[in-house]
Amino acid sequence: MSNAAQKRAARKARAAWTSCLDTHAQQEEWTQIFSTIDPIDFMLPEERKRLDELPNEFMVYRGYQGYRRVGLCWALSLEAANISANLDQTLPRGKVVACRVTKADVYALVLNNGLQIIILPKTFRSKYKSIYQAVR
């Protein structure tokens, strides 16, 4: 695939990701897609800049309900994770887990609806599964 075609594929994947209401249900498919796309092409210039500005090691938070504790989407702020933890009003109140990560663990940073979301690939999940810390 040519460089231009790779960039187009990344932009289409990004459009699908940012419009998807439930990325959790297709984690395996998204992981497969991300393995074929350069994150530089997936992120917008402002997102790449924001990711570059982060320290090498930082905290991320995941808000979840029910069985969705392990996932691809993490927030940079506890407030954003709290929102994610309670999106579905038909489910019991959710929880938030926190994890310290390095930039090398991050696939991409996406500014979606004003929330900074970190997308972490499947390798991250297996690497950090045993050190999740409940924060509430």
Language-model segments: residues:
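Conserved NAD+-utilizing ADP-ribose enzyme module
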Residues: 1-58, 63-72, 76-136
